[in-house]
Amino acid sequence: SEYEELSQALGGCYIDFMSGQYTINPLEPKAWSDGTEEMDLTAPDAFKKVTRLSQHIAFLKDFFRAYKDFNDAQIDTIEILLSKLYARFGITDSTDYSTKRPTDFPIMEDFYKLCEEEFYGYDKQRKYLYTEETLQEVCLGIHSMCVGSESKYFNGHTNITDSNFLVFGVKGLMDTNKRLKDAMLFNVLSFMSDKLLTVGNTV
């Protein structure tokens, strides 16, 4: 396309997400605020949380809900499992993200493995906050985006080149099913928000 040629001519990076060449890792915690503004009570939950991790988990709840029609119990289970996943990777509320590289964060495949692990290891004699059935439904719901046919759009570490000029090619995205499109646009939004707040000079 003309935008691809233009971005290459200017030394930029053209990102066609339908190609699967570039990945934005949904599980890499992004910045949702610069920490200086007063809390807006009407803002979405992702903007009202305090730490980058808690903000990002709030975003992920909306992200997963955009991808599949999860009910509240399933989303609450996903939140608990995400907290377990980040703890496993040493990502906490006090993590210094300036020392982290994209490869330091879990990817969707890791999240699916944890969900499967929790499901297959479910002990009916123990008390859990979530049911075995809910775990199974979560595993089924995220399978395609984590390890299945749609995983090429979500599963992997962020690999977008450092560039002052990025062009997001979303034309092909408009032809996909609504839930995949919404989840991918959510993911692009998280990346753009992060760059705007951490790098600046972003249009």
Task: Cite the ranges covered by each PLM segment.
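P-loop NTPase motor domains
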Residues: 1-13, 17-203
